[in-house]
């Protein structure tokens, strides 16, 4: 059943303050002893809002570092495809991830001009690359909270099988 306001213009109370969201992403520092502010990386990655100190620069830097270490442990040393969606926190989190990956010398593959990339496109790029190359395997990251509200950010790891 569709929402009663589906297809209608958003009301003022539906809108978020993207500048406040991004400011909180960089300015608020999570408390590692507070369970509500810890990374919870489930089957679809980590999701949360910077306003709740649940999706911030420190979270994404640490999660990306963990992915770098996981890749090394799994022998995944091919390119890493990274994409992002249009949510307000996706751009800042994408940049944080790129910085960590670059610092570790990861071969990063991203959309030209920092454009948006849907999750299936990243998955397909991984699958096609691994199918067509006998050498090092590729994997990926998608910065998206998927269907979560606009105030949320999301960060997903796609292993070499693409999903």
Where are these predicted regions, by residue range?
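Metal-dependent DNA phosphodiester-chemistry modules and their immediately adjacent helices/loops
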Residues: 150-163
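An N-terminal, well-structured beta->alpha segment
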Residues: 2-99, 134
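N-terminal small/polar loop signature for handling phosphorylated ligands or for N-terminal nucleophile
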Residues: 73-76, 81-151
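Phosphate-binding chemistry for phosphorylated carbohydrates and sugar-nucleotides
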Residues: 12-15, 20, 24-27, 107-116, ...
